[in-house]
Swiss-Prot record:
Keyword Repeat: no
Lineage: Bacteria, Bacillati, Actinomycetota, Actinomycetes, Mycobacteriales
Protein name: Fluoroquinolones export ATP-binding protein Rv2688c
Binding positions (ATP): G52, P53, S54, G55, A56, G57, K58, S59
Regulation: Inhibited by reserpine and verapamil.
Molecular function via GO: ATP binding; ATP hydrolysis activity; efflux transmembrane transporter activity; transmembrane transporter activity
Superkingdom field: Bacteria
One annotated GO biological process: xenobiotic detoxification by transmembrane export across the plasma membrane
The protein's assembly and partners: The complex is composed of 2 ATP-binding proteins (Rv2688c) and 2 transmembrane proteins (Rv2686c and Rv2687c).
């Protein structure tokens, strides 16, 4: 563990929102457990990502933490209590956005949010402001049954924010969205973190996880096989090489690679910098996708 990671871990002590220890769960009549001995913590104000292919156990873990599934082994506490030990006040403090839309199709987007707001005892957000934030203001009074798939994906995200939750559970929050609307959702998530909210995110989209998450856990067959910040995971498995793209003597684009160790004293590297027009210089980092495949031997499908 690096000095930075130790500092982060130390700062997380006393501010844990989620603690999972030895968590196991088997669905009735299933041959194998869906979750096998998971262990992790999530600190206040952290964006934590659970990453893995379909069927890895991500959504099951999330449902256990939300309280939708019971009878698990091990420990899964939120604010120092198992979800089953909480009363209705637990759901006043959390927000949930599932991957599959579940709205009232014969109500408008605005009416859906108004209805869900009525279920909370505390103050709630303005539905129109939430719809505007996710790009649905112009369709606020359109029946949800007439919404496109992308619109139906954005509505549950808006709904999850209606009670201004301290802890947000997001399942594939940008799945099925075009780049513009995916950017809106990501920006909201970043803003929520800046406001001290805690976000538990499950996805198989490595680019989204890399961009948003403070730490990620790779999950395969119900087990966590790696857990760290995206940057640390990539650095640990990156090639220590630098690629330079430059204009050759004839004006064509040429490429050269140099080892990072001893780069400051590499005469060939300095020759390229002195004698050619350099277009790009990049270190050869592994992508989070590359790391996942190397660690797990699996593709994200």
């Amino acid at each position: 563990m690096t000095a930075l990671n130790r500092a982060v871990a130390s700062a997380r002590v006393g501010t844990e929102v989620i603690r999972v220890r030895g968590l196991t769960f088997r669905y009735p009549k299933a041959a194998e457990p869906a979750v096998r001995g998971m262990e992790f913590t999530v600190g206040r104000g952290e964006i934590f990502g659970l990453l893995g292919p379909s069927g890895a156990g991500k959504s099951t873990t999330q449902k256990l933490l939300i309280g939708l599934l019971r009878d698990h082994g091990g420990q899964a506490t939120v604010w120092d209590k198992e979800p089953a030990e909480w009363g209705p006040d637990y759901y006043e403090r959390i927000g949930v956005s599932f991957e599959l839309p579940n709205h009232y199709q014969k109500l408008t987007g605005y009416e859906n949010l108004r209805f869900f707001a009525s279920l909370y005892a505390g103050a709630t957000a303005d539905p129109m402001q939430l719809l505007a934030a996710v790009g649905l203001a112009d369709d606020a009074h359109t029946l949800v049954g007439k919404y496109s798939k992308g619109m139906q994906m954005r509505l549950p995200f808006a709904r999850s924010l209606i009670n201004d939750p301290e802890l947000l559970f997001l399942d594939e929050p940008t799945s099925g969205l075009d780049p513009v609307n995916a950017r809106k959702i990501k920006d909201i998530i970043v803003d929520l973190k800046a406001r001290g909210r805690t976000i538990f995110l499950t996805t198989h989209d490595m680019a989204t996880a890399d961009e948003l998450c403070d730490r990620v856990a790779f999950v395969v067959d119900g087990r966590i096989v790696a857990l760290d910040s995206p940057t640390e995971l990539k650095i640990a498995r990156s090639r220590r090489r630098v690629r330079v793209e430059y204009r050759g003597d004839g004006g064509g684009l040429e490429t050269a690679e140099f080892g990072m160790d001893g780069l400051a004293d590499d005469p060939a590297f300095h020759s390229v910098l002195r004698n050619h027009h350099v277009e790009t210089i990049h270190s050869r980092e592994a992508s989070l996708d590359d790391v996942f495949v190397e660690v797990t031997g699996r593709q994200l499908t």
